[in-house]
């Protein structure tokens, strides 16, 4: 038999008149058949019932662009009205109009230290007219404006900390200090109302289409250190209710808005959050470590199938990787091959060379065609994922309604065999017409032949995507 226990980790409390508690949402899916059928039943259910919609329609593939680390400064602490508008114009001029223009941490007064959160207004030295001109520029060009917030973590001595000490949860250490960060008390309805009004006003004034919320703090000690006796779990439960109410109110007040949930990259991906938000930034680890990303994508495609990847490469000429390479390789085709996800951030910079823009303009259409199939098709991993530079990596997607799909094979930087044979999903009675958008090659195979093996020979540190059409389903 199977024993399953779920619930809030710590809960031992009495309730006061008028209070409610909210239990964690769960889904239990029964199925018959093999793992592949279960995987794709979940994906179909997730797309239909969990993934938020954009103006009532499924969210399509999104290409994101931004200006990260300008002048060597942290994150987005050096963004200005001028350099943002100039960068958008440069990308458009080079044929790279994004779906999303992304401004992350650092647009507020923080003295070039993005972690100083709690001064929630645009840095007047960088944005003398607020963020409205950037948002209007995006709207004019048909681009969605994404803006980062982290309202729950409040840095010591910022405006919010000073103006509303009654909303600050602190953890006192053994020396009597209360650290650098506080947790905003979203269990408090007045605090919720204040935050709703603030962010709603910014969404409207700055023409924000995607509200991005981060959460770079471990909240449990703050909750547990500020609870009444016999009320263990109350602060966590009421805080969770508060943040869900905050999001729900933003969505009601701003039709067409959608939310990107980050939470230190890949946390807070529970079903209640995922019903309201998309984890565009699914991790803070390994953006340019191709073999690590392959394992991450393997899990994301199966469980939370809308996410974003970067076209970053942290490998060196000797075949070794840096954990966090501050001087990554220029964007190339391999970086795109390893960033095939429903959403993508091209790391071609706005002031990059014509050669780099040429790579992007070559690969972006291939990514978009593949991404559409990632969202409409069933998913078939074709290799074991061991996070090894010595392995090949392969996957397949096929739209069951149209019969269109693709097979991707990537040869990692130290994979020694010169050829690789995958065993794709195929109908033995069908015929498949294949094409490679990069080389222009075409071929035809029967389903019976495909079941025996699909063999690819490519150089180290390269990849190939073979699109196909199952004959009779055009």
Give the ranges of each region predicted by the language model.
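Aromatic-lined carbohydrate-binding/catalytic grooves of carbohydrate-active enzymes
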Residues: 58-197, 206-210, 222
């Amino acid at each position: 038999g199977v024993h399953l226990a779920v619930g809030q980790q710590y809960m031992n409390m009495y309730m006061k008149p008028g209070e409610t508690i909210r239990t964690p949402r769960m889904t239990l899916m029964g199925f018959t058949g093999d793992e592949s059928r279960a995987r794709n039943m979940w994906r179909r259910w997730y797309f239909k019932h969990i993934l938020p919609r954009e103006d009532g329609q499924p969210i399509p593939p999104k290409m994101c662009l931004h200006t990260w680390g300008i002048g060597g400064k942290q994150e987005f602490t050096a963004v200005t009205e001028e350099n943002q508008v100039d960068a958008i114009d440069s990308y458009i001029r080079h044929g790279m109009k994004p779906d999303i223009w992304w401004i992350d941490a650092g647009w507020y007064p923080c003295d070039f230290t993005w972690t100083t959160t709690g001064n929630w207004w645009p840095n007047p030295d960088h944005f003398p007219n607020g963020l409205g001109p950037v948002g209007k520029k995006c709207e004019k060009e048909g681009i969605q404006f994404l803006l980062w917030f982290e309202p729950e973590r409040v840095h010591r001595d910022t405006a919010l900390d000073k103006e509303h000490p009654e909303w600050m949860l602190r953890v006192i250490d053994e020396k009597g200090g209360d650290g650098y960060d506080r947790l905003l008390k979203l269990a408090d309805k007045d605090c919720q109302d204040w935050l709703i009004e603030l962010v709603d006003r910014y969404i409207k004034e700055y023409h924000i289409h995607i509200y991005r919320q981060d959460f770079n703090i471990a909240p449990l000690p703050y909750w547990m250190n500020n609870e009444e006796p016999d009320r263990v779990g109350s602060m966590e439960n009421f805080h969770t209710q508060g943040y869900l109410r905050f999001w729900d109110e933003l969505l009601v007040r701003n039709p067409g808005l959608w939310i990107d949930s980050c939470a230190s990259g890949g946390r807070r991906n529970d079903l209640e959050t995922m019903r309201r938000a998309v984890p565009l930034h699914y991790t803070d680890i390994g953006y340019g470590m191709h073999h690590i990303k392959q394992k991450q994508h393997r899990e994301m495609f199966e469980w939370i199938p809308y996410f974003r990847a970067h076209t970053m490469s942290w490998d060196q000429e000797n075949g070794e990787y840096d954990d966090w390479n501050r001087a990554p390789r220029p964007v190339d085709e391999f970086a795109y091959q390893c960033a095939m996800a429903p959403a993508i951030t091209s790391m071609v910079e706005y002031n990059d060379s014509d050669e780099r823009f040429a790579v992007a303009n070559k690969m972006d259409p291939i990514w978009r065609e593949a991404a559409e199939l990632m969202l409409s098709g069933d998913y078939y991993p074709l290799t074991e994922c061991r996070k090894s530079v010595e392995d090949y990596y392969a996957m397949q997607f096929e739209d069951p309604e149209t019969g269109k799909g693709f097979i991707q094979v990537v040869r990692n930087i130290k994979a020694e065999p010169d050829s690789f044979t995958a065993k794709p999903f195929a109908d033995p009675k069908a015929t498949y017409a294949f094409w490679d958008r990069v080389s222009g090659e075409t071929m035809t195979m029967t389903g019976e032949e495909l079941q025996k093996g699909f063999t690819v020979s490519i150089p180290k540190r390269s990849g190939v995507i073979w699109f196909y059409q199952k004959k009779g389903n055009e």
